[in-house]
Amino acid sequence: MTPFTQHTGLVAPLDRANVDTDQIIPKQFLKSIKRTGFGPNLFDEWRYLDIGEPGRDNSTRPLNPEFVLNFPRYQGASVLLARENFGCGSSREHAPWALDEYGFRAVIAPSFADIFYNNSFKNGLLPIVLAEAEVDALFEQCLANEGYQLTVDLAAQRVRRPDGVEYSFDIDAFRKHCLLNGLDDIGLTLQEADAIGRFEQDHRARQPWLFGALQ
């Protein structure tokens, strides 16, 4: 997992509340358990004018010119600005996978659905909760200024606007540690590889009959 320390990126404003996981990545794309291949179908039913199918070449599909991520000014955005209850609906880890593969490093909103919020941290995507008034101010600035960028400083737990105004955000200390060091569940386990190896050796020595079939 790529470490997240500080990131400055173009902001895309998704001015919709209660965006659910089926809108983030529709159900027909959930057959794969790999973490890759979902970015092209992020917000598929909003980005395209037709119905997407797994394995289809998206380069030939008609784009929806009214969807924000298709606007030329937001191409290359890496910070998503959203409204309340982002990521609600069914539990699917594919949602943060799709956002991450598209290129988003952080999502800023007044609130998130709990399962999506937890899944995001496990996959290197930083969900940031700010006060609704602060999110409103960011929407206003983003819509008024083409090329609008924000700096997210995870170490300091701050979001900095181009005019220097900063907003602080809360994050669990353990989740912060994992993001700063690029540690997912597998990475955390591998940190204890030596201790796990010692336990296995001791376990085998104390209870060898359990391992007879493995000799």
From Swiss-Prot:
Disulfide bonds: none annotated. The keyword Amino-acid biosynthesis applies. It comes from the Bacteria. Pathway: Amino-acid biosynthesis; L-leucine biosynthesis; L-leucine from 3-methyl-2-oxobutanoate: step 2/4. GO terms for biological process: L-leucine biosynthetic process. Its EC number is 4.2.1.33. One of its GO terms (cellular component) is 3-isopropylmalate dehydratase complex. Keywords: Amino-acid biosynthesis, Branched-chain amino acid biosynthesis, Leucine biosynthesis, Lyase. It catalyses: (2R,3S)-3-isopropylmalate = (2S)-2-isopropylmalate. One of its GO terms (molecular function) is 3-isopropylmalate dehydratase activity. InterPro entries: 3-IsopropMal_deHydase_ssu, Aconitase/3IPM_dehydase_swvl, AconitaseA/IPMdHydase_ssu_swvl, IPMI_Swivel, LeuD. Belongs to the LeuD family. LeuD type 1 subfamily. Catalyzes the isomerization between 2-isopropylmalate and 3-isopropylmalate, via the formation of 2-isopropylmaleate. Heterodimer of LeuC and LeuD. This is 3-isopropylmalate dehydratase small subunit. It comes from Xanthomonas oryzae pv. oryzae (strain KACC10331 / KXO85).
